[in-house]
């Protein structure tokens, strides 16, 4: 299968070389964590002398004997080379029970630069502080962005065609190897079902998957809608699915921990405080929705909103849903001292639709940038101080358009 260098992620790892931290590569299943690790190993071998690379891949039967943490520890120590910079890479580390005991011991010796990846359900962001006694840095890997998708296909189609395809295929690049739509959908659906019906069931000892699956499908079908565990519980109960808001709240957390969804909380712009009552959920990859639900209730405005949310997260922004009086701002994106207010729409050619998007932004009185992202087909232009951007241009050139 063809691969492309994921420069942004690779540069981030390069910048962390030889820092005194455990580097933990996380992300949804099949997002490219293992390939990224291999690319970094090759970079080290190509550019540095006097290095010693110790690589363990627990998906490879050659390392089956190391699935016991004492054996793992002894194997690494035996391969340490005095006088060289020693780099330790462990792929699918969760396949060694109690792996953290070996990793923590090796880290404490201060003689290895350690990098690990693991299955999304067993190496959760929420668990890292508990697992590792030393410092760690998380490198979170997302599925392909639209820009990476275009690079993969060498931009040999017009942008309009590439964009239409991306809204269906999404960014799980393993699916690109298949020539038919059915095979691509089956691949993505298998990735999704492995997480929901195997990884999460095993991780949390869930008695059955019906509630979890119906919850996940509900969230997919309601991307960009504010919701809460109580609302979802009531809806499922009406469909004769026995559950309660406590269970739904836990299951939502599990799905987010495994990076199937990202939860986006509300922010009161006027009161400058975060609101807890309801939130929105966005899929980690838009291709999952099409693979699981097909075109049912397909709303491109919501699809575009999901794409914009993911792009903001990829770029390191903290993302919130804005509330201003009774109005809603799709996204308030913050990164350090930066802040951007963003509205997303599929089509703003109708005056009424355009007004619905810009009116809330005009009520915000601070000087931070305010933008509307839509499928305009036009170069960037301004209205009352608001920048209007074509979604394809923004996804490809966001650093130039913000």
Predicted regions and their residues:
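Conserved lysine of the Walker
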Residues: 33
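Short glycine-rich substrate-engagement loop in P-loop NTPases that contacts/grips substrate
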Residues: 54-84
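Domain-level recognition of nuclease-like catalytic cores that cleave nucleotide substrates
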Residues: 377-402
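Accessory nucleic acid-recognition modules appended to NTPase machines
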Residues: 181-339
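Interdomain motor-coupling "hinge/lid" segment immediately C-terminal to the ATP-binding subdomain
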Residues: 119-121, 126-226, 259-262
